[in-house]
Amino acid sequence: MTTSKSQNYLLKLATGSGVCMSAFLLTPEPVDANICSLDNPLSINVMGCYKTPDRYVVKILEMGLCTSNPLSGTNFEGSTCTPTYTNADGVEIDVAAGAATLTGGTSTRPASDIYPHAYVKMANTFGLKGSYQLNSNTYCSKSDGTADATPGCTAQNFTETLRSFSGRCSNPYNTDDAKASEVLTEGTMSARLTNSSYVTATDCDATHLVGALALTNSVVIDDSTAGLEVQFTVSNSGMTIIPTNNNGNVVGQFAGGPFQAVFSLY
């Protein structure tokens, strides 16, 4: 197992082959996963639609591979996991901006083995920015995530914090509010909202997010494997455009959408 300071751990954002992990993001309303289309204003529908954001900043603290599911129990259990990248303070990267570099952390080559699971640990805050043209009107994100329809507007940065997968903080906070899962082509994705010790949240006060993927096809590390590359993409998915009415013809709010992280061997 080889460990080194990761000063040039490249995150390629182009589409590529590898292990795909979809992360979950909170939107203020349930969203039908339509892709926004300028050619079809009805694509926004009453529930909203997805588009590529101008800015999508995430803070990564750890990524790695596991020989068993780290989220099979109530909390994250990493005893069978090998971190491929760690940074105790976290490193912020703008996934929407193109190639980014994970700096200040430690990169580790996993031992030769078969890994049926992959995971990522991150902060539960997301830095976003975007705009959308609908019915000849351009809407821009404001600093609180609401839409600015002023002619000639400029999109502003805003921050979204994920505290519940249900889109609301129940009273009392339900255990289902802190977890989510989805069956993907690449495997079954699970996610948990946690505290800084990666204990699953029991109240609306989460500070971190963990995602784990039970892979359809395991990652096989052998002696010829030099390491892992990670690719992120938010194309047609990283931002949610939310209308103000049932007709879906006026934009009221911008929110986060899902992104994907892809682990590739080299």
Regions found by a protein language model. Give the residues of each.
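A short, solvent-exposed, low-complexity linear motif enriched for acidic/polar residues
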Residues: 32-266
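Intrinsic disorder/low-complexity segments
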Residues: 15, 24, 146-150
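Initiator methionine at the very start of the polypeptide chain
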Residues: 1-2, 33
